[in-house]
C-alpha cells in the first residue's frame, strides 16, 4: 500500500465512520504528510518502524511546542491504529512512544466591563454593524465555538423555545439556551441589514453573511474581533475563543456547576471543563468557606 491510498482510506474512515469535521481531517492529513516527507518517501506506510517515528519526533521538537507535538503523536497513532484495524500491519510503531508532558495554560478571559467596552466599539452606522454586534453577543451569550458560529443556519434558530441548535466537533449536535439580549441582536440583524444582502442560493440558510452574500469564514470572524480589540486598546490576546472562555468563567463565578457548563460547551469530558475552576480563586475560596465544616 502506498501513502496516497493509505491517507485517502484513513480520511474516508475519519469522515464516514468517526464523523470528524473537515478541519479535523485536514489536521490529521497535514501531520501524516509531514512524516511522509520526513522519511523522504523511502518507505511505504507498512514498513515504518519506531526508529522512524523517534527520528521524526526529534526533528519536530525543534519547532513545535509540547502541545503541538502531542497532537502530531495522537494523529500518527490513530493512523497506524487504522492500518492495524484494516489488517495491513500487526503492530503500531507508536506503541511505546509517550507524548511529551504539556503545561496547562490558563485561557485569557474578559471581564463583563471589557466585553461591554468591546461592544461599544462596534460601529452601528455601517452595514456590517448589526451583524458584528450579533456575532459578539452570540459568542459570549451562548459560548459557542467559532466553527459552530460560521456554520449556524437560520433553520437552527428556535427563538420561540429560546434555544439554538449547533453542530460541534465530530458533527455532534446540541441545543443551547439563548438569552433575550442575544436573541434580540440576532433578530435585528436578520430583519434589517441581512435582508438587504443579495444572498447566493447556496448560503440562503446561513445566518452570518459577508457583503457578497456568502457565509463568513473563521478567518473573517478573527479579523472582526482583532479590529475591535485594537479599538478598545486591549493588551491581552483576544480571539473568538476568548468569549467562550469568558462565558464559562462568568457562569462559574455566578454559581453554575461544572456539569451544566460542560453540557453547554459541548465538552465530552468534564476534565476539559475543569480548567475554568483554576480561573476563579475567589469562587473556590467562597465555596470552601460556605460548605466545609472546618472553614
Q: Which ranges hold each PLM region?
A:
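Conserved catalytic core of the tyrosine transesterase superfamily
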Residues: 1-295
Amino acid at each position: 500500500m502506498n501513502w496516497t491510498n493509505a491517507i485517502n482510506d484513513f480520511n474516508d474512515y475519519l469522515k464516514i465512520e468517526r464523523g470528524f469535521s473537515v478541519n479535523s481531517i485536514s489536521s490529521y492529513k497535514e501531520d501524516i504528510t509531514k512524516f511522509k516527507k520526513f522519511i523522504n518517501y523511502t518507505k511505504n506506510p507498512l514498513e515504518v518502524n519506531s526508529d522512524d517515528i523517534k527520528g521524526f519526533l526529534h526533528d519536530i521538537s525543534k519547532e513545535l511546542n509540547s502541545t503541538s507535538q502531542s497532537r502530531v503523536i495522537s494523529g500518527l497513532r490513530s493512523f497506524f491504529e487504522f492500518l492495524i484495524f484494516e489488517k495491513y500491519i500487526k503492530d503500531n510503531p507508536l506503541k511505546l512512544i509517550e507524548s511529551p508532558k504539556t503545561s496547562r495554560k490558563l485561557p485569557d478571559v474578559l471581564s463583563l466591563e471589557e466585553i461591554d467596552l468591546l461592544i461599544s466599539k462596534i460601529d452601528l452606522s455601517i452595514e456590517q454593524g448589526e451583524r458584528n454586534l450579533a456575532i459578539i453577543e452570540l459568542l459570549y451569550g451562548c459560548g459557542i465555538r467559532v466553527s459552530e458560529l460560521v456554520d449556524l443556519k437560520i433553520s437552527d434558530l428556535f427563538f420561540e423555545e429560546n434555544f439554538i441548535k449547533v453542530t460541534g466537533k465530530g458533527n455532534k449536535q446540541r441545543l443551547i439556551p439563548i438569552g433575550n439580549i442575544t436573541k434580540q441582536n440576532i433578530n435585528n440583524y436578520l430583519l434589517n441589514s441581512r435582508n438587504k444582502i443579495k444572498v447566493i442560493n447556496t448560503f440562503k440558510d446561513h445566518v452570518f453573511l459577508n457583503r457578497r452574500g456568502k457565509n463568513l469564514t473563521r478567518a473573517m470572524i478573527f479579523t472582526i474581533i482583532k479590529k475591535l480589540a485594537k479599538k478598545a486598546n486591549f493588551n491581552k490576546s483576544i480571539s473568538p475563543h476568548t468569549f467562550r472562555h469568558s462565558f464559562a468563567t462568568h457562569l462559574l463565578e455566578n454559581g453554575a456547576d461544572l456539569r451544566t457548563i460542560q453540557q453547554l460547551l459541548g465538552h465530552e469530558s468534564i476534565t476539559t471543563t475543569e480548567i475554568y475552576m483554576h480561573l476563579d480563586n475567589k469562587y473556590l475560596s467562597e465555596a470552601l468557606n460556605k460548605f466545609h465544616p472546618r472553614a
